[in-house]
Amino acid sequence: MPRTLSLHEITDLLETDDSIEASAIVIQPPENATAPVSDEESGDEEGGTINNLPGSLLHTAAYLIQDGSDAESDSDDPSYAPKDDSPDEVPSTFTVQQPPPSRRRKMTKILCKWKKADLTVQPVAGRVTAPPNDFFTVMRTPTEILELFLDDEVIELIVKYSNLYACSKGVHLGLTSSEFKCFLGIIFLSGYVSVPRRRMFWEQRTDVHNVLVSAAMRRDRFETIFSNLHVADNANLDPVDKFSKLRPLISKLNERCMKFVPNETYFSFDEFMVPYFGRHGCKQFIRGKPIRFGYKFWCGATCLGYICWFQPYQGKNPNTKHEEYGVGASLVLQFSEALTEAHPGQYHFVFNNFFTSIALLDKLSSMGHQATGTVRKDHIDRVPLESDVALKKKERGTFDYRIDGKGNIVCRWNDNSVVTVASSGAGIHPLCLVSRYSQKLKKKIQVQQPNMIKVYNQFMGGVDRADENIDKYRASIRGKKWYSSPLLFCFELVLQNAWQLHKTYDEKPVDFLEFRRRVVCHYLETHGHPPEPGQKGRPQKRNIDSRYDGINHVIVKQGKQTRCAECHKNTTFRCEKCDVALHVKCSVEYHTE
């Protein structure tokens, strides 16, 4: 019976016979795999060689898969039999047991023929249906635009699950829609009126006291609502979805954001970081970003910053649709399908090198869309472009390009550094000139730029613009629970989207700060409930330094009797500077340290 070859014998064959082309070597676990101590590789963790393999691994039975061989057509016999006409030839497989097939579908690589030619294609038409102008036939206030997203259904969902969660803890919350809007107004106000501690909004000291907040909601009531805020039923959470506590709200806001998308043709897709400094399995660290620690959201947006679609990153995506294209490309395809379903049409998508691949461009083209994006070298195999090193030695503005038979063009352009861009909707021409500063000449010079680079620069920054808008007035009130940061981000996102619609459809738009202030004032003045007469609050704290300075402490008569700050008996006099009730006879003792 033919014997099974070991890993050591197979590697010897590969080293001595150059005619053998192997695509993979599959080995069995070594005999000491379950032993408490096993021999280890002597090489480094990265960049090791075949000479560093341990002896137990070299003597393990293995089989070799040659290029072009079909592993599924092998015989069930675990051994092998050489061919009669060439006994020295290595068979296509040496096997003892085939590994289980991978669950993930893999893309078949198709080699393309590239030639040096420009891409000539007409721009896509954009949306087929008309934009939702019927919602803006009359002038809408900032609050009315915001409530296109935070409508009665969304507010009732938050109120329902917050009351349900409080009830499960034995607390009668009794939250109403009007009270939640007042609560949300305080959250929005903290974005442009920031205090070190949120309780300082309700302090009576004149340096931090906020009349609008303290007159709208009691401090303890705000804390109770914040600690019980929920948007899902904890008894029915999806164990696979790590963001199931937020999923009902995210789904509803995605529907509304997609419903009111402005009539645009170009959409960008990128990541968005939400700051978070606690512990959670989905927390990310991205070096070089303005926000390095926090939750990562995938967002699709217009070039001006209206976010149409967003999903939180949670490692393995529960949605396995299009997973054969990879993590980044599958998300772009999910966004494109959601956009096309809500607004049928043909669009141009722009994204960075995390998402771009030739397979993704082909897939979007088959759906009637176009795309442009920077691309990594390993995502464009065997494109005969000039190397980065060669282009870097040439003058600024030099570029090289190739196009395949399916209408995908790849261009490598030398600017400050060499950048590679792939596109199915923009070519090299018309060339444009851009201004750059030359270190050598010590002046600005004109550099030629391909059209596809211009398209990428013009339409890529939508998500970054939204990030900048939100971060400028991000709510300073934060909770300790892991979901408080992404939950408040959802409210910030729809407020920013409402402002984008206001800019698009209003004849006299205001800036984001003024828009935010109008929403805050409306919510706190309309839905706030001032403290009832007779409610007793904390005693007012006075500045000790001014109390004992001995300057201008004048005792004046007041209209009604109040308690003396020194002897606590009723008096009709008060200190005008300290603003406390005070007998004339108690003034010296009160103002002496």
Swiss-Prot record:
GO terms for cellular component: nucleus. Residues 38-47 have a biased composition (Acidic residues). Residues 27-53, 69-105 are annotated as: Disordered. Changing residue 415 to G: In a breast cancer sample; somatic mutation. Pfam families: DDE_Tnp_1_7. Keywords: DNA-binding, Nucleus, Phosphoprotein. It is found in: Nucleus. Its main location: nucleus. Expressed in heart and oocytes, but not in granulosa cells (at protein level). The modification Phosphoserine is found at residue 86. Binds in vitro to PGBD3-related transposable elements, called MER85s; these non-autonomous 140 bp elements are characterized by the presence of PGBD3 terminal inverted repeats and the absence of internal transposase ORF. This is PiggyBac transposable element-derived protein 3.
